[in-house]
């Protein structure tokens, strides 16, 4: 239902009272695109995977929304949820690190900035990790690094394809060098995975920056990206001030990186699952259970 249809429906069924209007606004009935400012009925926007029908802008989605978009129904088994961050450095800025962790957990319902687990995709076994930017900017601390390392090691041991969906501002400053060490740990686990000739696919979403870009995010055998995702290490302003020169237009976008060979393919969100499924098939990842695609999935495969 778009905006015009909604107004027609309201005209037909009568006007809303002031209380009803306030309730619908408060309940988030409408979603405004941050790119083109188009207004969309929230349920329709979510059914469209949080992609603006007007301009194609890909809104950020959290891990709880992303996982069902990718895995087979009833196949997801979370791993390492019990791992929780503490405060090894006693870090304080405006707020203490434990306070920030508590606020992030209350806001997102997550225990840290990544959710990991085992699942199947079209009946093929995968080890999937999905980062959530809402949790302290998707920053990588010791728990995020540990979960990724364990996930990849489990994928290697069980001969599963590893898939990581990245969304991060980089290393978590509240953990200092303990956060930076995770760059090496995750990279080492992925090198062992590659040495065992197992597949790793990295999916870069908006934004993927800092220490995550400098480590596991760019180590995929195949690197996919969502349209117009910001991908880089330092920010544009920092680089321009350091180099004292203007950067090219579109620098640090998925399209720029694709043009210069750092990304293999840009994939719209609706096509991400069928694209991953096709990659698994082409790389010989066998099915462990029968898979019967829905009519929508069958149509998507035919269109590829």
Swiss-Prot record:
The biological pathway it contributes to is: Lipid metabolism; malonyl-CoA biosynthesis; malonyl-CoA from acetyl-CoA: step 1/1
**Uppermost EC category:** transferase
Cofactor note (record): Binds 1 zinc ion per subunit.
Q: Which GO terms describe its cellular component?
A: acetyl-CoA carboxylase complex
Record Gene3D superfamilies: 2-enoyl-CoA Hydratase, Chain A, domain 1 (3.90.226.10)
Needed cofactors: Zn(2+)
Q: Name one Pfam family in it.
A: Carboxyl_trans
Can you state which reaction this protein catalyses? N(6)-carboxybiotinyl-L-lysyl-[protein] + acetyl-CoA = N(6)-biotinyl-L-lysyl-[protein] + malonyl-CoA
Q: Where in the cell is it found?
A: Cytoplasm
Q: Which UniProt keywords apply?
A: ATP-binding, Cytoplasm, Fatty acid biosynthesis, Fatty acid metabolism, Lipid biosynthesis, Lipid metabolism, Metal-binding, Nucleotide-binding, Transferase, Zinc, Zinc-finger
What is one process in the GO biological process aspect for this record?
fatty acid biosynthetic process
The Enzyme Commission number assigned here is: 2.1.3.15
Sites where the protein binds Zn(2+): 33, 36, 52, 55
Question: What GO molecular function terms would the record report?
Answer: acetyl-CoA carboxylase activity; ATP binding; carboxyl- or carbamoyltransferase activity; zinc ion binding
Domain CoA carboxyltransferase N-terminal span(s) in chain numbering: 29-298
Oligomer status and interactors: Acetyl-CoA carboxylase is a heterohexamer composed of biotin carboxyl carrier protein (AccB), biotin carboxylase (AccC) and two subunits each of ACCase subunit alpha (AccA) and ACCase subunit beta (AccD).
Q: Write out the similarity annotation.
A: Belongs to the AccD/PCCB family.
What NCBIfam families does the record tag this protein with? accD
Q: What is this protein called?
A: Acetyl-coenzyme A carboxylase carboxyl transferase subunit beta
Organism of derivation:
Gloeobacter violaceus (strain ATCC 29082 / PCC 7421)
Q: What is this organism's lineage?
A: Bacteria, Bacillati, Cyanobacteriota, Cyanophyceae, Gloeobacterales
């Amino acid at each position: 239902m778009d905006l015009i249809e909604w107004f027609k429906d309201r005209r037909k069924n009568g006007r809303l009272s002031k209380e009803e209007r306030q309730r619908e606004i408060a309940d988030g009935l409408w979603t405004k695109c941050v790119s083109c400012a188009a207004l969309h009925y929230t349920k329709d926007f979510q059914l469209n995977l949080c992609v603006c029908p007007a301009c194609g802008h890909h809104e950020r989605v959290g891990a709880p929304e992303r996982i069902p978009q990718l895995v087979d129904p009833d196949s997801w088994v979370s791993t390492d949820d019990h791992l929780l961050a503490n405060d090894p450095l006693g870090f304080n800025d405006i707020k203490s690190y434990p306070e920030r962790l508590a606020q992030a957990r209350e806001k997102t319902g997550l225990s840290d900035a990544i959710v990991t687990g085992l699942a199947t995709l079209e009946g093929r076994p995968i080890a999937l990790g999905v980062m959530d930017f809402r949790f302290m900017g998707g920053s990588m601390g010791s728990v995020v690094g540990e979960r990724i390392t364990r996930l990849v090691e489990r994928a290697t041991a069980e001969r599963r394809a590893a898939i990581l969906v990245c969304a991060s501002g980089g290393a978590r400053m509240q953990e200092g060098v303990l956060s930076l060490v995770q760059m090496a740990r995750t990279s080492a686990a992925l090198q062992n995975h590659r040495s065992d000739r197992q597949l790793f696919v990295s999916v870069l979403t908006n934004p993927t920056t800092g220490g995550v870009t400098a480590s596991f995010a760019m180590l995929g055998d195949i690197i996919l990206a969502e349209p117009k995702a910001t991908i880089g290490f330092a920010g544009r302003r920092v680089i321009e001030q350091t180099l004292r020169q203007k950067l090219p237009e579109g620098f640090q976008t998925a399209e720029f990186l694709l043009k210069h060979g750092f990304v293999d393919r840009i994939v719209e969100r609706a096509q991400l699952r069928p694209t991953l499924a096709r990659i698994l098939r082409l790389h010989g990842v066998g099915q462990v259970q029968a898979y019967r695609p829905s009519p929508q999935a069958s149509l998507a495969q035919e269109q590829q």
